[in-house]
């Protein structure tokens, strides 16, 4: 059915749930800021794609993918903890570079727009 096919991909978007918790509950944390959310997700997913293409789907590649993602986020000052799961999802499911753009970049952008509107409604300064 259409519903079961749609639910089959839900696990690929799990990090977004944790991102939502940050932007709604601790919106003033540096880890929840738009730059961190968007670039953290993009850079970590890209790290997963790179490691997958270099090493395939192995236990070592899973660890290296997460390590690379954390390193890149730290070096770019874009740490966003939920994004740390992206390399695992990318490697386990064998995603290509297109995954970085859709659903990752588009989804992260939508979360930022939602966070802005939600926090504005509550009269809180998100951006």
Residue ranges and their predicted role:
Residues 9-17, 51-69:
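Structural signature of hydrophobic alpha-helical transmembrane segments
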Residues 35-43, 65, 85-86:
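Cytoplasmic-side transmembrane-helix entry/capping segments in multi-pass membrane proteins
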Residues 1-11:
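Single conserved hydrophobic/aromatic residue that forms the stacking wall/gate
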Residues 5, 20-32, 46-48, 63-73:
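Short juxtamembrane and helix-loop transition motifs at transmembrane-helix boundaries
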Residues 5, 47-51, 55, 68, ...:
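Alpha-helical membrane-inserting segments
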Residues 48-52, 85-92:
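Generic transmembrane alpha-helix signature in multi-pass membrane proteins
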Residues 59-63, 97-109, 113:
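Loop-to-transmembrane alpha-helix initiation sites
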Residues 24-25, 88-99:
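Interfacial segments of multi-pass membrane proteins
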């Amino acid at each position: 059915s259409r519903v079961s096919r749609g639910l089959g991909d839900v696990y690929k978007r799990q990090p977004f749930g944790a991102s939502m918790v940050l932007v709604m509950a601790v919106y003033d944390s540096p880890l929840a800021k738009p730059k961190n959310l968007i670039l953290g997700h993009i850079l970590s997913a890209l790290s997963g794609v790179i490691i997958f293409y270099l090493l395939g789907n192995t236990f070592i590649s899973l660890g290296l993918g997460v390590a690379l993602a954390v390193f890149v986020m730290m070096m770019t000052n874009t740490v966003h903890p939920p994004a740390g799961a992206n390399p695992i999802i990318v490697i386990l499911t064998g995603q290509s570079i297109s995954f970085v753009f859709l659903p990752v970049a588009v989804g992260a952008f939508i979360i930022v727009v939602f966070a802005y509107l939600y926090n504005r409604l509550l009269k809180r300064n998100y951006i």
